[in-house]
């Protein structure tokens, strides 16, 4: 009987908040980071198009179990809309499908912003990862098919005009999961009667991570010059953020080492005392600052749903 294969790479865990450069795909970025860190597992918390730059949170090791909590968080983008053309991809990459010589006044742009704030119905771009009949919309679009993509509700918490010129307007948006900034540019262009597409897009925030957490890819690649393997990996690991930081919006409990052992074995622990936390469907437990488990608090117990190895 053959022995099970050991996973390749180091069993490290944590978040690397990459400042993704332009013309670099999200999957390509994850592969590069996994290779640099010699990690067993890696995954990202939300695709960033090759023509977009900025924050791409990448989870290594056990941190991949916390990816859904980051994907569901608020995001902030800075973007520029070029007026006068609507394009097939709703950004610079596509072909022009509609054009207009009209250009919007700044007052008209500002007057339009409330329409796109709050819970809105939005149709994703034809070139998107939305599945239609089991196939990705972008695959169908590349084959020349025009498909009906149903509108979806998304939430925009804030939409601000930063500045404008005759052919361009610069915005900042804070939005929830599933919001397509390309669709926003397309729809605003139609409403203003001039058409529009994304000329530049940069993500600056994915809750709970901020701009101060971002690391340029060039800084990480530069560490390849360190010949000593252990020294190079230690320098890379210094950029990692603790796995538990992704859960900072959830209720938290601190446990001792004995309780941590029970939780990691999949067993519940009893929460006693006047300061015992209130029931909640999701909370996370740490021991000595290290993430132990995600679980629910019910009937005076913390019941683990996902456990994390000793980090």
UniProtKB/Swiss-Prot annotation:
The active site is at 49 (nucleophile). Keywords: Isomerase, tRNA processing. The keyword Isomerase applies. It comes from the Bacteria. GO terms for biological process: mRNA pseudouridine synthesis; tRNA pseudouridine synthesis. It catalyses: uridine(55) in tRNA = pseudouridine(55) in tRNA. It is an enzyme of class 5 (isomerase). The keyword tRNA processing applies. Pfam families: TruB_C_2 (PF16198), TruB_N (PF01509). Its EC number is 5.4.99.25. GO terms for molecular function: RNA binding; tRNA pseudouridine(55) synthase activity. Transmembrane segments: none annotated. Belongs to the pseudouridine synthase TruB family. Type 1 subfamily. Responsible for synthesis of pseudouridine from uracil-55 in the psi GC loop of transfer RNAs. This is tRNA pseudouridine synthase B. The gene is truB.
